[in-house]
Regions:
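Mid-to-C-terminal alpha-helical segments outside catalytic/metal-binding sites
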Residues: 1-26, 42-50, 58-59, 276-291, ...
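Catalytic pocket-lining loop regions of alpha/beta-barrel enzymes
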Residues: 3-4, 155-291, 320
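Short amphipathic alpha-helices and their capping/turn segments at secondary-structure boundaries
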Residues: 15-22, 44-54, 117-133, 190-200, ...
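Short, well-ordered coil/turn segments that N-cap beta-strands
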Residues: 23-26, 55-59, 99-106, 131-135, ...
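Conserved, mostly hydrophobic/aromatic
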Residues: 31, 60, 86, 107, ...
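Alpha-helical scaffold segments that flank or form the walls of functional sites
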Residues: 37-102
């Protein structure tokens, strides 16, 4: 099995450092993780070190990654430990010790929606432990038959998004006013569309640009993938209940392979290769329904945090101020009900 993500190499990353562009613009990082895995520790202090690069981060959205599970509890309730941990980080930040930054201001937990109606007590306990900071749920759903296209340490089986039990779980999610985050590849956007049409009142956030693939059988097929991804994304955008996270292109499955170079890319280089994807996505959904994300530390194996945000800022430099405000903070604030 291929390692799902490029390894983080601090010395390699340190070769490129940039001053922040548009440094006073408020940013809500709509997607990051914290974990303590063997050889891959990335906790709050590590994230804080990354964001201390001059950009004005005002809040962040923590997204489930099977971190800090309550292993002494029955399996369905182990995911409660993760939201409890993230809420503790958020409480520390909310004390004002980090200035205006509200770390983990919104939390996307990992309750197993395949439990169907039985997920209800898990969701209720998560809400009890994390309170209003619990804003959504995400399950592991990105699947492809090719083993080179694995982006999760625990790959899911196929077809989860269409399972009747999963849909019963979605009904429980909707009943509680929670958001559904979905990470799926571009080959699965038809399944995402079916979910969006089946649950028109459920707010759905599609992660990582809808997963345009560039590795495995899609290596060297970028034009064909872009055409299919664009068409499916435009169809999905017709569902008013769907929003799109812009980012995640530093994963190996995206196929850009910045990690094999002797030096990490600068923001101008990233902007050049990302611009078609970002502009197409924004054209489909509009700035009102798009939100920028770092996907750190997953994408950290390819480029630095400050470089990432400079690349985003370069791509939308000519946008209206109101649209930039939506992309960098407003859409995330509205979607995940972040106060401030």
């Amino acid at each position: 099995m291929h390692a799902p993500h490029a390894p983080v190499r601090p010395q390699w990353l340190a070769q490129v450092s940039e001053a922040p562009l548009d440094p006073n613009r408020a940013i809500i990082d709509a997607h990051h993780h914290l974990w303590d895995r063997p050889g891959q520790r990335y906790l709050a202090e590590d994230y804080l070190a990354d964001i201390a690069c001059g950009h004005r981060l005002v809040a962040s959205v923590y997204v489930q990654c099977r971190s800090m599970l309550a292993v002494d509890r029955p399996e369905p309730f182990q995911a409660v430990g993760e939201v409890e941990y993230a809420n503790g980080v958020a409480a520390y930040s909310a004390s004002g010790v980090l200035g205006e930054l509200r770390l983990c201001a919104a939390i996307v937990g990992g309750a197993n929606l395949l439990l169907g109606d039985a997920v209800a007590p898990v969701l209720d306990e998560m809400l009890q432990r994390a309170g209003p900071r619990l804003r959504g749920i995400r399950n592991t759903t990105a699947w492809h038959a090719d083993p080179r296209l694995i982006s999760n340490p625990r790959p899911p089986p196929p077809g989860i998004l269409l399972e009747p039990a999963f849909h019963r779980g979605l009904a429980q999610l909707q009943r509680r006013g929670l958001v559904l985050d979905i990470w799926a590849y571009h080959t699965q956007l038809g399944e995402v569309l079916e979910v969006a049409r089946t649950f028109p009142e459920l707010l759905i956030v599609v992660d990582h640009l809808g997963g345009p693939l560039g590795a495995g059988p899609y290596a060297g097929q970028r034009d064909a993938v872009f055409a299919r991804w664009s068409a499916d994304l435009r169809q999905l955008a017709q569902c008013a209940n769907v929003r799109l996270k812009l980012g995640g292109l530093g994963m190996k499955v995206a196929g850009f392979d910045h990690h094999v170079a002797s030096r990490p890319p600068g923001s101008a280089a990233l902007a050049a290769v990302w611009r078609p994807y970002l502009l197409q996505a924004i054209d489909c959904f509009g700035a009102q329904r798009c939100l920028f994300e770092s996907n750190f530390p997953v994408d950290k194996g390819m480029f630095g945090y400050g470089v990432l945000w400079n690349a985003f800022k370069r791509v939308v430099a000519d946008f209206a101020e109101a649209d930039k405000d939506r992309l960098f903070s407003g859409t995330a604030r509205e979607t995940y009900k972040i106060e401030g």
